[in-house]
A protein has these predicted regions:
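N-terminal lobe/hinge region of extracytoplasmic solute-binding protein
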Residues: 43-92, 122, 188
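Extracytoplasmic/peripheral linker and loop segments enriched in polar/acidic and small residues
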Residues: 23, 379-382, 412-478, 506-507
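Gly/Pro-rich hinge or "lid" segments in bacterial periplasmic/extracellular proteins
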Residues: 164-216, 221, 231
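Ligand-site clamp/hinge motif
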Residues: 209-255
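Long beta-strand-rich cores associated with HINT superfamily self-processing modules
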Residues: 474-507
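Surface-exposed binding/hinge segments that line
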Residues: 97, 132-175, 197
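Structural transition elements
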Residues: 305-339, 349-356
Length: 507
């Protein structure tokens, strides 16, 4: 590897940016843009939608900036690790005790302690609406000394510690919580970076927090721009205007230096749901015929330009333990003959790739002997009909783990008799029993195996045919070091992330 010192040639970089919109595969080095204060420039996909309140999806921005922190974290395997809490114990089926760090300060200089945790979690537990991680969960929190809290639930909840990893349950200082219900994260977190400015939906600035309880951040700060346009985000990376870019569109990735493009497996599966209650798909043999007709590789290679993973089950590579525990699926019903059966295949336009997926699926099903009618609308105009079972088949890009990092809630919602998102209209007692068993187990190998047992039953029904697992494309300049590539999109810039002044390139 060739190491190139670039400190002296920074000033020469700007004219080079104007020469071309594409990378030169023969060019081994690209000078670093003017950024001598080691601040990371970040282009994000979506602007804040709820004033950066941690009780909304904006919480994930606060965690990706390492400004707001939770009591616990999840590691790459989905296992719990300490954060603001160092220990956790289940006292009773409905009570958990959390031991807190004693050396932590909020960005405003106030101490982190049990009182602050009780205030933050009680605010979340009594919010209207609640953060989605607390849907159906009733919490009460009490201090147990200065650096310990006890969290009570109305019913046994073996996943309570996992829930507390959600960025929506970040702990901010008392000063963040206004009398009017507004929560202000500026200068009130505990993370490695202090949020100092937010300029509406255009930009934000963060500085290194010198009083951080962990290792101080290696970068001096973060300058955030919110850039919804995918072409603009990709162009910013190409022209060295930013250092890290969220969600580069698949169509733009080939135009970038491949060394700057990093694909991150997502816990999201593109799935074909089949109506098991009415119409031609109520026949298991016809569902099996659909299953056998699908050419996943064609869809991955064409629509996704090979930037997705062919599905082996409902849970993909973003959930590492799933493949290790998956057993071959036993399909009880052989494929029947479509004999020209007319089916309605539906999807929505909000995810731009799905209508194209529908075109390829229609071709494949037609070749298998079906007659296919396509229905494509905006999601807001089609969801109610999909849930009412008005289509024979529905293509959906579905998140398979929610905020707790556990798939049971998704499986229960989509495939149980009482599921609130049961597009397949599926109701089988053995599946319900398997999901009930999994839901009652504590986190760990036994629960994971129970989840995979439930997945096997769902796949054997052919009510849902997983096609592919999506990836998100993250862009990083050649000078970025140790940016997080997180399938859950909870972390991005940590205290270890920085910009190097030395670039390693191939000879």
């Amino acid at each position: 590897m060739l190491q190139v010192k670039i400190g002296l040639i920074v000033g020469l970089a700007a004219p080079l940016f104007l020469l071309t919109g594409c990378f030169d595969s023969d060019n081994k080095t690209v000078p670093l843009a003017e950024n001598d204060n080691n601040r990371i420039r970040l282009a994000m996909l979506l602007p804040p939608r709820s004033g950066l309140t941690p009780l909304s999806d904006d919480a994930f921005k606060l965690s990706r900036w390492s400004t707001a922190e939770t009591l616990l974290n999840l590691n790459d395997e989905g296992n719990l690790t300490p954060a603001l809490a160092t220990e956790w114990h289940r006292l009773t089926p409905t009570a958990w005790r959390f031991q807190l760090r004693s050396e932590v300060l909020f960005h405003d200089g106030t101490p982190f302690n049990a009182k602050a945790v009780v205030n933050a979690l009680n605010t979340a537990a009594t919010a209207k609406p609640k953060p989605r991680i607390l849907d159906g969960v009733d919490l009460t929190i009490e201090a147990d000394g200065e650096y310990s809290v006890i969290v009570h639930t109305a019913t046994p909840d073996p996943l309570l510690p996992q829930r507390l990893t959600s960025p929506q349950l970040s702990i901010l200082s008392h000063n963040a919580y206004g009398d009017n219900g507004v929560i202000n994260p500026i200068n009130t977190g505990t993370g490695a970076f202090v949020l100092v400015n937010v300029h509406g939906t255009s930009s934000a600035q963060l500085n290194r927090f010198e009083g951080y309880w962990g290792e101080p951040a290696k970068a001096a700060g973060i300058d955030v721009s919110f850039v919804p346009d995918g072409l603009a985000r990709a162009s910013a990376l190409r022209t060295h205007s930013v250092d890290i870019v969220e969600a580069i569109p698949v169509s733009q990735a080939p135009l970038l230096d491949p060394n700057l493009v990093h694909e991150v497996p997502m816990p999201r599966t593109n799935t074909l749901y089949l109506n098991t209650r009415q119409g031609v798909m109520a026949d298991p043999a016809i569902r099996a015929a659909v299953r056998d007709a699908i050419d996943r590789e064609q869809i991955v290679n064409t629509v996704y330009e090979k930037r997705a993973d062919i599905a082996q089950g409902l849970l993909g590579p973003a959930i590492p333990w799933a493949a290790k525990l998956r057993q071959p699926i036993k399909h009880p019903t052989p494929a029947g003959h479509p004999n020209g059966a007319i089916i309605t295949l539906a999807t929505f336009t909000d995810r731009t790739e799905l209508p194209e997926v529908a075109v390829y699926l229609a071709q494949q099903l037609t070749q298998a002997g079906f007659k296919v009618r396509q229905v494509v609308r905006e999601y807001s105009q089609i969801e109610a009909d999909a849930l009412a079972g008005k289509f024979d088949a529905f293509i959906l890009s579905r998140a398979t783990v929610l905020d707790s990092g556990d798939p049971v809630a998704y499986m229960y919602s989509d495939f149980s008799c009482k599921g609130s998102f049961n597009i397949a209209q599926l109701c089988q007692l053995d599946i319900d029993n398997a999901l009930e068993k999994a839901s009652e187990l504590p986190a760990g190998l036994e629960r994971q195996q129970a989840i995979m047992d439930a997945e096997a039953l769902i796949l054997a029904s052919d009510a849902a045919i997983p096609m592919l697992h999506e990836r998100v494309i993250q862009g990083e300049s050649a000078y970025v070091r140790h940016a997080d590539r997180d399938p859950r999109e909870r972390t991005l810039i940590s205290n270890q992330t920085y910009l190097s002044t030395i670039i390693e390139t191939s000879k």
